[in-house]
Swiss-Prot record:
Keywords: Toxin. Belongs to the MSDIN fungal toxin family. Processed by the macrocyclase-peptidase enzyme POPB to yield a toxic cyclic octapeptide. POPB first removes 10 residues from the N-terminus. Conformational trapping of the remaining peptide forces the enzyme to release this intermediate rather than proceed to macrocyclization. The enzyme rebinds the remaining peptide in a different conformation and catalyzes macrocyclization of the N-terminal 8 residues. It comes from Amanita phalloides. GO terms for molecular function: toxin activity. This is MSDIN-like toxin proprotein 5.
């Protein structure tokens, strides 16, 4: 159950908070680069 919840949580975040998801993606991309 924990694995399923952990997998679904980000999906809900991207659906309900697309702006936040974009910011997170930009931050991760900058961190990697």
């Amino acid at each position: 159950m924990s694995d399923i919840n952990a997998t679904r949580l980000p999906i809900f975040w991207f659906i309900y908070f697309p702006c936040v998801g974009d910011n997170v993606d930009n931050t991760l991309t900058r961190g990697e680069r």
